[in-house]
Amino acid sequence: MNVKIEQWMNWILYDELMEGKCNAPKQLLGNHDYGEGQMITAYKPHSVNCKVIAPAGKTEYEMEKVDDNGFYALYLPKKKFVGSKYRLVTNYQDGSTVISADPYSFENQIGSMDVYLFSEGNHWEIYKKLGAHPMKLDGVSGTYFAVWAPHARRVSVVGDFNMWDGALHPMHLIGSSGIYELFIPDVGEDAVYKFNILTRYGEEIYKADPFGNCAQFRPDNANVVKDITKYRWKDSTWMENRKTVTRNDAMRKPMNIYEMHLGSWKKKVEDDENGFFSYRELAPMVADYVKDMGYTHIELMGIAEYPFDGSWGYQVTNYYAPTRRYGDPEDFMYFVDYMHKNGISVILDWVPAHFPRDAHGLGKFDGMPLFEHPDSRRGEHPDWGTYIFDFGRNEVSNFLIANAVFWAKEYHIDALRVDAVASMLYLDYGKQDGNWLPNEDGGNENYDAIKMLMKLNKTIEELEPGVFVIAEESTSWAGVTAPVSMDGLGFMFKWNMGWMNDFLEYMKLDPYFRQFNHNRLTFSLMYAYSENFILVISHDEVVHLKCSMINKMPGLHDDKFANLRTAYGFMYGHPGKKLLFMGQEFAQLREWSEVRSLDWYLLDGEDAASHKGIQNYVKTLNHLYNTYDAFYYNDQDQMGFEWISCDDPQSSIVSFIRRGSTAKDQLLFVCNFTPVDRDGFIVGVPCQGKYTEILNSDAEEFGGKGRTNPKPLKAENEPWNNREQSITMHLPPLSVVVFRYDYAEKKPVAKALPKQSTVKKSTPKKK
C-alpha cells in the first residue's frame, strides 16, 4: 500500500464503513486535500478495479485497491481535481462498467441556518431541504437525499439504482443535527428508494421518506423521486385574489361544501380494487357536476398517501405525497388547477393527530420513538391502534406545520380540515383511567398540542393569506375559532357536531314524537354564534350501520323523501356554512363504502323520479344559497337570524327570518316537521309588503305533491306571533317553504296637528 495512503487513512472510520456503521462517510470517502496534494477514495463493493478520470476523459489514474472489499484510494502529489470535477470509472465482476461522479465529493446543501431553524421548529420550507430532490450540482444531474434520524447509527439510501444495498450509499451526518444527507449522481425522476437505517440496537430497518413527494402504488410502499417544481400552473388570477381574502371576508362569503372520496365517487371499473379514474380523468367530471349542482367548495378525503383503503386516508404514511391511487403529483396539481379554473375551492382533509404503525411509516422511525411521544401513555391511541405525534418536539411540530404550508403553497390547496382535533386537545381522549399522563398542572389538556395548533393557524395566516383551517372538534372547548391574538386556537371554522347530532336524532323520530324533543331542533341557536360554525352531514354519518340519510328518515317511501327535503331545507336556513357528503344529494339508499362507486344507477332506475327530485331540490337549494346572501352573509352575526316562532312544540312548526347585507331580499323560512297539511296557515311577518315563495320542498319538480303558494302573499295588518302583520299561506306536510321579501320600516302615521287658536284683532273705539 502506498505509504501516503496508509498514513492518511482513518482506520476507525474504515472499519465502521466495512461493518456498515459509518455515519460520516465524507470524512473518509471523496476528494480530500492532503498537504500539497490530494487523496481520492472510493468504496465500490463487487468491483474489479476503479479509475479516476477527468470529466473530458483525457486524463486517467488507476486507483489502488486497498482491500478485497472494494475500497480504493488514489494519492496525487499535486492537486489535479477541484471538488467534484472528476469521474470514477468502475469495472464490476459481472463485466459492467459504470462511469459516474463521486457522491462523496459534493458539498452539503443544508446550511447551518436550515439546521438551526429546524431544531427551533420554525423552518417552514424544510420540505425543500429534506426528502429527495432532483437537481444539478457542479453540472452533474442527480438527486439530493436528506433525512432526519437522530437516533440512527447509520443511514443509507437504497433503491432500484443500487440493488437495494445499504453498503453502497451511506449518508453523511451533519454535525449533531440528526440530519443525514447525500447527493447521488445520475439518479433521476422515477427512481424508487427507501432509507436503510441501522438502529443503535444493531437492527436494520427500511423506512419510507417522511418528506418524500411521491410514493409507489399500494401495496408497494417505497418512495419515488419526483420533481414537483415543473408543473406550470394556470391559476395565477385565482391565487392573487386568494391573497386578498381576509378573515372577515371569509365569514361573509358563501361556503357550500361537497365532501368527496375520489376513489368511490365514480369508479372506472367496478369490483376492482384498483379500478380508479385518474386525477386528470376525474377533474372535468367533478368540476362539471359540482358547478352544475351549485357547490362552492369540494372537500377531499384521503389525498395524502396511506396504505390501507379501509382507513379512508385517515392513517397517513406519506404526508408530503398525494396518493398514487389516482396518479402522480403533477396529476393532482392538474386536478386542483382545473377546479380553480372552474371557480371551485379545494379543501384537503389533514390528519396531524396520529399516524399508523405500518413498518415502513413514521413509527419508531430510527429505531426509537421519534415522531411519536416516547411515553406510550401520550404516544399511543389504544382505540385506533395508532401513534400520537410528539407535539412538544420542535422538529415534529415543524414537520406538521411545514406540511400544512406545503399543501397550500405547492399544491395551491385553499383550506385544510384538521381531523380529530379533540383527540389532540385532551390527554385522556379515548383512554381509561390510569392509562394517560396528566399535564404539569395535573389536568387533561395537552399543552403541547394547543401550542402547536395555535402556531399552525398563525403561520398559515401569515404565510398563506386567504388560506383557512377548519377544525373537526367534537367537544365544547372554548375559543376554537377565536384568533390566536385573543388566546383562541385560531381556526377559521369549526364543524358543528352538536347541531348535527341533535338534528339527526330529531329527524330520525316519528313525527308524532318530535313534539317531545323540540329542544333538539332549537337548542343549537343558543350557541350558534359562539364559534364560526360549519353545519356538516359528513361521511361519518352514513357508515357503520348508521344508515344513509334517506334511510335515517321515518315513514314509508314518500314520507322519507319529504322528511329528507325538510331536513335539508332547515339545514340551509340555519346559520352556519354548509357541508354535505357525496351521494346524499340524490338520496343514496345504501351506506357509503370506499370499495364501490356511488349508486348513480338510482337516477335511472325504477324510482328515478324520487332520486332525481331530491337531487334537483339540493341543486335548487345550492343555487338559491349562492343567489341570496341572506343564506350566508351574517352567519356569524346574530342580527342575521331571528325567530318568528320556535315555541310551538305540539305542532312541530318553526319559522324564522334570515337577513343579508341589505334590507332587500331577506328570507322567511316556515318549516313543518309533521305530516299535517295546513292550508290557511298564519305566520307573523316582520314588515308590510309582498312575500314571494322562492322555494317549496313540496313542489312537484322535487318529488312533492305540488302544494305551493304560486302568487305573492301580501302582509295583512293582523297581529300574529307577536308581530303586527301576518300572511296566510298553504304549509304542506313535512315541508320547508321559503319566502323572499324586502324589509320596509313601518311608516309612522301622520297625526293631525292641533288647530291653532286665532284671536280677532280688536279695533279701538272712537272716542
Show where each model-derived region lies.
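Conserved, mostly hydrophobic/aromatic
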Residues: 42, 147, 195, 260, ...
